[in-house]
Amino acid sequence: MSKLNIDQKTVLDLFSSKKSDFLIPDYQRPYAWEEDELAALWDDIVTFAIPHDNAEGFDKDAEYFLGPIVTFRNSEGKLEIIDGQQRLTTLMLLLRAYYSRFENMQDPKSIATRGDIEKCLWKTDEFGSPDKDQLKIDSEVASDGDKKEFLSILETGETTSQNKSRYAQAFNFFAERINKFIDAYPSFTPHLAMRILKNIILLPIEAESQKTALQIFSTLNDRGLPLADADIFKSQMYKYFSDKQQKDVFIDRWKKLETRCTDIFRKSRSNPMDELFTRYMYYERAKQGIRDTTTEGLRDFFEKDSYSLLKDDRIMGDLEALANFWNRVDSQEGFSNRILRRLFVLGYAPNRMWTFLVSVYFLHNRDKEGQLAEVPFYDFLERITGFIWSYAIFRPGVNALRTPVYPAMIEIVNNQEVTFEDYRFNRESLQNQIHAYQFTNGRPITKSMLIWWAFQNPNQQLLDNDLKLDIEHIYAKKRAQFSGDLSDTSLLESLGNKAFLEKRINVRASDYQFAAKRALYRGDSGDGKKREVTKNQELIELANKSDEFTETDIKIREDKIIDSFLDYLASNRLLK
């Protein structure tokens, strides 16, 4: 069982301890606190330490809990910070700004305060005197070009007009706030400093290893910036490329890759670089022939054999190529129109599995320029669309989809055609399931089906990936509620009564009779001014064809959608 050292400590107790020799490791992210976070911390501290603007009203036993600091002691005896580096860095800058004000003061309280702050910032000799050449914290953040500025500020207590880093901004912020505080409450100045040192509480958690520390971190509800798996991977790759004398080249490539991924995967719930590594992981899994549907975690997969997969010259090239591919998908460039249409539809898939399949396909089949052969790629996209859509109805849940998809990934890297031969659907059975399925708006497959259907229309134009689309009830719910002319109100949630519609138009159209909806679809305002026209070609055609949409129309349209979908599956050899 892992051993942990957990002991609540004040800032002074933790920072001044001779055992406290902190290291911000190379896999951590650069300092990121901005003025909002700094102001919130400062205001909280002042409110706590000087209650109701009265230093004498402070309870000396009061405590202000700032959060945990998760570390482990590395092979060099330094405490590597896994969680809490943002707040720890901020406290160091705050204390250094305070120290600069006390540096030349000679009254007893100021001398005592200065002495305590010195023990927090610098290592001391056996007599307790600070060695100002040895800070209590060091930084090795690989992608942080400003780390030297951070260490310089701690050493000198000064910034210049040339210093533009977050560290300099934080130091200057605290210096300014301290000056204002001294002007307003000159007699309270030492009190505030001592209460920061002796009444702000941290919870240092020292684990016996990096892995244990990371596991602890993942369970904590952190106020700071979460450490991503990709940060750990960056550390391993940084060491590998440093040993090959390619450190600076690696850092530059990593920064560019990180910037690109932040833009590409802006909608992702996970860290953008984690998203890229996840998509790459499925390629490596396929090459290893892994069919097991119990997918291990991202870090668990890559840490095997001491991160051997990451210690390879080709890794950065593969990641860059994969990011460039998804950038082209996102920007809708570099593909034929028919492939862009398929990719747009897949963007509304009921789950993310398609992105893993397509990533494996790209990495295995790309040419030297990162291009894919048009015809086989289009056929592949067509088939996985039909299969993923059908499986979401036939056997809902992404976990179930792993069973047929993981073997398909292995087929890709073995140069075999993906056919899903063992998982083809019975037409009649699937037809009955689709008719019985409740296509409520809360189910992702509902919008998936509607987008697929819209793009079966050859006149449907390609849409921007960032366009916000809602689900429109063509026969309005309010109309059914007040008119009572639907014999079966469940038809309201039928695929035959739904279509995608731009959010801005949907807000206006939601409660109208179809005659009024027609005008909104076509952009007719009634006052002669033209408004936004829907980009849903089918709705335009419906609006131009009739001034009514009835129960019969719902049923006819539902049958048409379902029959067309089944024909689509048949054309892609997905039916028995």
Features from the language model and the residues they span:
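Glycine- and hydrophobic-rich flexible loops that cap the catalytic core of alpha/beta enzyme folds
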Residues: 2-287, 524-525, 547-556, 560-575
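Betabetaalpha-Me/HNH-type nuclease active-site subdomain
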Residues: 50, 54-77, 405-546, 569
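Secondary-structure capping and boundary motifs in well-ordered enzyme cores
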Residues: 61-62, 82-87, 192-197, 205-212, ...
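Flexible loop/turn segments at secondary-structure boundaries
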Residues: 78, 88-89, 209-213, 224, ...
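C-terminal, active-site-flanking charged/polar segments
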Residues: 90, 222-246, 252-256, 379-392, ...
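Short helix-capping/linker segments at secondary-structure and domain boundaries
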Residues: 101-105, 224-226, 290, 363-373, ...
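A cross-family structural signal marking well-folded subdomains
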Residues: 201, 230-233, 237-449
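Non-catalytic regulatory/linker segments of enzymes
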Residues: 206-209, 403, 519
